[in-house]
């Protein structure tokens, strides 16, 4: 009887030990990694997919300033063409007109008009300035906080607007006289005879005024993107 009790207790102990070990094994199994950590990693890695021009960098307006800086760069490249074309068009506008024989010739030359000479110089300076300003414009794209560079470009753009406006206005007055003449001064219009000269000078004036318009747009954009200082009043 006692032997059967002992074996029965051992049997119970074996089952109890088996249950204890199984519960211990289940409790000791390592827990899986939490799912929110993976989602946080994906959300953090998604910031690198944002385009460079739209990254805020801690300030809400930096992305907009970079986009305007890219537009500034493109407009400077676009303004280089009209200024260079205007200078070349006036410089190559000379025309000869033969009357009856080759011994009687009339010439229309740009250097006979001081306004056209000033026009060529001003547009050549503006074309060179557009090329030299491209690295500074690229610097404003890379760093939206380049306040000194933006201020320098704003001042130089304003000077170029004044220079080109004066040159284009003076040349436009000469082109008008060439087309219409002046009856009070007994100046006859010459465009009826010198068609090529008048076409080139008229096109050059239009191109120069187009460059003036582009520069004015650049000035407005620079004033808009210029950072403003905020004054905090002590309470």
From Swiss-Prot:
GO biological process: cell wall organization
InterPro entries in UniProt: CASP/CASPL, CASP_dom, CASPL
Disordered: region residues: 1-46
Subcellular location(s) of the protein: Cell membrane
Topology in membrane: Multi-pass membrane protein
GO cellular component: plasma membrane
Residue numbers on the Cytoplasmic membrane side: 1-67, 137-150, 225-235
Keywords: Cell membrane, Cell wall biogenesis/degradation, Membrane, Transmembrane, Transmembrane helix
Transmembrane domains' residue ranges: 68-88, 116-136, 151-171, 204-224
Keyword Cell membrane in record: yes
Top-level lineage group: Eukaryota
Sequence ranges on the Extracellular membrane side: 89-115, 172-203
Subunit structure as annotated in this protein's UniProt entry: Homodimer and heterodimers.
Family: Belongs to the Casparian strip membrane proteins (CASP) family.
Biological function: Regulates membrane-cell wall junctions and localized cell wall deposition. Required for establishment of the Casparian strip membrane domain (CSD) and the subsequent formation of Casparian strips, a cell wall modification of the root endodermis that determines an apoplastic barrier between the intraorganismal apoplasm and the extraorganismal apoplasm and prevents lateral diffusion.
PANTHER family: CASP-LIKE PROTEIN (PTHR36488:SF11), CASP-LIKE PROTEIN 1U1 (PTHR36488)
Name under which the protein is recorded: Casparian strip membrane protein 2
Species whose genome carries this gene: Oryza sativa subsp. indica (Rice)
């Amino acid at each position: 009887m006692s032997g059967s009790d002992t074996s029965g207790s051992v049997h119970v102990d074996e089952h109890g030990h088996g249950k204890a070990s199984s519960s211990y094994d289940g409790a000791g199994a390592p827990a899986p990694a939490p799912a929110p950590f993976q989602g946080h990693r994906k959300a953090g890695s998604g910031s690198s997919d944002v385009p460079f021009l739209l990254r805020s960098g801690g300030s809400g307006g930096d992305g907009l300033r970079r986009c305007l800086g890219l537009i500034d760069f493109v407009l400077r490249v676009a303004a280089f063409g009209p200024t260079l074309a205007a200078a070349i068009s006036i410089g190559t506008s000379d025309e000869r007109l033969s009357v009856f024989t080759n011994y009687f010739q009339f010439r229309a030359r740009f250097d006979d008009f001081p306004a056209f000479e000033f026009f060529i110089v001003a547009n050549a300076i503006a074309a060179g300035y557009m090329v030299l300003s491209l690295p500074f414009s690229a610097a404003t794209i890379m760093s939206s906080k380049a306040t000194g560079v933006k201020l320098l470009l704003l001042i130089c753009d304003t000077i170029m607007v004044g220079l080109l406006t004066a040159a284009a206005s003076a040349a436009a007055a000469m082109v008008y006289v060439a087309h219409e003449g002046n009856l009070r001064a007994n100046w006859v219009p010459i465009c009826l005879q010198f068609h090529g000269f008048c076409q080139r000078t008229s096109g050059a004036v239009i191109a120069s005024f187009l460059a003036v318009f582009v520069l004015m747009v650049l000035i407005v954009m620079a004033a808009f993107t210029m950072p403003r200082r905020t004054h905090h009043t002590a309470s």
